Amino acid sequence: MDNCILEIKNLSHYYDNNGNKTLDNINLKIKKNEFITLLGPSGCGKTTLIKILGGFLSQKNGEIYFFSKEISKTSPNKREINTVFQNYALFPHMNVFDNISFGLRMKKTPKDIIKEKVKTSLSLIGMPKYAYRNINELSGGQKQRVAIARAMVMEPKLLLLDEPLSALDLKMRQEMQKELKKIQRQLGITFIYVTHDQEEALTMSDRIVVMNEGIILQIGTPEEIYNEPKTKFVADFIGESNIFDGTYKKELVVSLLGHEFECLDKGFEAEEAVDLVIRPEDVKLLPKGKGHLSGTITSAIFQGVHYEMTLEIQKTNWIVQSTRLTKVGEEVDIFLEPDDIHVMHKE
């Protein structure tokens, strides 16, 4: 991989002496200036991986190369890697300026350089007039920005962010997502971001690493992860999905509920049992008799930007999202284009 700055090779970690693994044979390459997100449910190993990369935890086996140098034995303060934690870890007895400048002062950086770097950092996070505010006077979003500024002022080659926005309300979280992406682009620093929030990962990332039970299930762009999931878990975890049992009848044709549909996926045997993934927003509703399969709307909920409806077809429930409401009890048909159906091998 061109411009690779971090390479993780065959890395494993055990959480007890019985061989139970938190991380199982992790292999990953990360590029310079990349915003990469580790995404998965609680307990999947993503925070453990961040702690190992930051030097706060040691792996059982495997290697970590940072700019081609093995750093497993390198102490955290010598790695040129900084970490922003979920709880901010700010010093409550220091003001904003002193919090941001703490690392620089520990390195005995000249005062005039410290002043200039802090000024630049405050401007970057949109808080130029907050240098001498007390930490307890700040909102949650402002505290998070200060924590990020404190990490960035050290000019790390790599910034690790462990669920930094999880304590914020929805609106503030969305605003900070935009700010973080903007800051990352301006500085050209590589970000490794940890979250269990699928929307957050899809919004911010250049690439997403989907993890579960200590292993990497899929690596790809947000578009690849959403539109081309490789496993049932990924399809179900990233957004809402309709996942049905189907049959790959022949090349570019699948069978679902007795109807044959055209598809775009290849690489399957004739008559192979497969999983079919259909996103709720891709299901088109038509008047009865005009589509592929017929069913009845059994529920409808308004969710702000669209209606989410449940459609029963041959005793299977389909989630359908549309800006147009179809009333409960109404009989309709569905219509699917070839690119609305994603075919996966059975696990």
UniProtKB/Swiss-Prot annotation:
Domain named ABC transporter: residues: 6-238
Any one of the GO CC terms: ATP-binding cassette (ABC) transporter complex
Catalysed reactions, semicolon-separated: ATP + H2O + polyamine-[polyamine-binding protein]Side 1 = ADP + phosphate + polyamineSide 2 + [polyamine-binding protein]Side 1
EC number(s) on file: 7.6.2.11
Alphabetical keyword list: ATP-binding, Cell inner membrane, Cell membrane, Membrane, Nucleotide-binding, Translocase, Transport
GO MF annotation: an example: ATP binding
Membrane-topology annotation of the record: Peripheral membrane protein
Record InterPro entries: AAA+_ATPase, ABC_SmlMolc_Importer, ABC_transporter-like_ATP-bd, ABC_transporter-like_CS, Mo/tungstate-bd_C_term_dom, NA-bd_OB-fold, P-loop_NTPase, PotA-like
Annotated binding of ATP, by residue: G40, P41, S42, G43, C44, G45, K46, T47
Statement: the UniProt record of this protein carries the keyword Magnesium: no
SUPFAM superfamilies the record matches: MOP-like, P-loop containing nucleoside triphosphate hydrolases
One Pfam entry name: ABC_tran
Domain of life, per lineage: Bacteria
Enzyme class, spelled out: translocase
Localization: Cell inner membrane
Quaternary structure note: The complex is composed of two ATP-binding proteins (PotA), two transmembrane proteins (PotB and PotC) and a solute-binding protein (PotD).
General function of this protein: Part of the ABC transporter complex PotABCD involved in spermidine/putrescine import. Responsible for energy coupling to the transport system.
Database matches in NCBIfam families: potA
Family listed: Belongs to the ABC transporter superfamily. Spermidine/putrescine importer (TC 3.A.1.11.1) family.
Protein known as: Spermidine/putrescine import ATP-binding protein PotA
Organism the protein comes from: Borreliella burgdorferi (strain ATCC 35210 / DSM 4680 / CIP 102532 / B31)
